[in-house]
Amino acid sequence: MHRRHVLAAAPVLLSLPAWAHHGWSSFDQARPIYLEGTARDVRWRNPHAELKLELPADAKLPADLATRSLPPQSAPVDGAALLRAAQLPTRKDRVWDVELAPLSRMGAWQVPEIRNGDRVAVLGFTFAAEKGDAILRAEYVFLGGRAYGLRSSPV
């Protein structure tokens, strides 16, 4: 009888880490953050690609950021408004953990595989009031002069 309970509970228990990992409600989606730097410790794998982004000491917003062209995607994302509202983080961490999209979505966008040492820029969201770890959930990634939407598939 005990074994049957364990087997019945296993799927629920095994799904808890995935549920906790993908709960984005604590990210402040009203305050887009722009980061640009050098990719380190790139992990190109599922459930989603991740990297550490090493920022320069003199980080600044690019002058053309608000006017950059963004590709359409299937989710209703007001990318132009996000670009206009983008700001640098107030915290002074020089290294941020950046969470990208699942590999299937990265493939749909034809995002080139990011490698250690690549120059990368991202626009995304961190925790409310920038509390907790320096983690950014990327909404857009900018590579090689191109922008890629990460919330949904390209249209």
Q: What residue spans do the PLM features occupy?
A:
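N-terminal export leaders
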Residues: 3-7
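N-terminal signal peptide c-region/cleavage motif recognized by signal peptidases
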Residues: 15-17
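Short boundary/loop segments of OB/S1/cold-shock single-stranded nucleic-acid-binding domains
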Residues: 19-31
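Structural detector for short beta-strands of small beta-barrel domains
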Residues: 32-45
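Short aromatic-glycine-enriched beta-strand elements
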Residues: 45-56
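Beta-strand/loop nucleic-acid-binding surfaces
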Residues: 93-109
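Short nucleic-acid-contacting surface segments enriched for D/E, G, S/T with interspersed K/R
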Residues: 107-121
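OB-fold/S1-family single-stranded nucleic acid-binding modules
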Residues: 128-152
